Amino acid sequence: VASGRSEVHPQKKLDSVDQRQLFSAVGQAKLINRYYELFREHSIPVGQVLTTKESFGTRRHYLNQKNCMTVMLENNVIPIVNENDTISVSELMFTDNDELSGLIASMMDAQALIILSNIDGIYNGSPADPGSSVIREIDHGKDLSNYIQATKSSFGRGGMLTKTNIARKVAD
């Protein structure tokens, strides 16, 4: 959505759904082209998989997605998976891409899930506090609520809380 916002300047005021659909349609094309170019430099083919939360709700759609990505991986094609924001209904959208990545990792029986962030990790205090440090290892079941702020970056819908919740679900 953000990528498309920089490209398109609507002639009239749009409601939030129309904006999301317009910007995501344009942004998705930019995004997949960028991934294509980056991976092509290493002779690695990529393919686009657009999904919705509804696609995880029925066995038929779930298995179809899994089969698609399995065939891609068997043929050394990297699936670039993203929510299909152009048709996603607001009430049924993923919390964020972390939730989507967790569902994909579980679906594909992935050996690992790497969740990226603009924060170095979970701190034992406020990340802005110079006396705080990253917690290097977290025991399974440890309560992290005292360490995680519910804030999120201006770039997305989630935050560190969502990341840790997804990590716990996938690890179980």
What are these regions (language model features)?
Residues V1-A171:
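Nucleotide/pyrophosphate-binding catalytic subdomain
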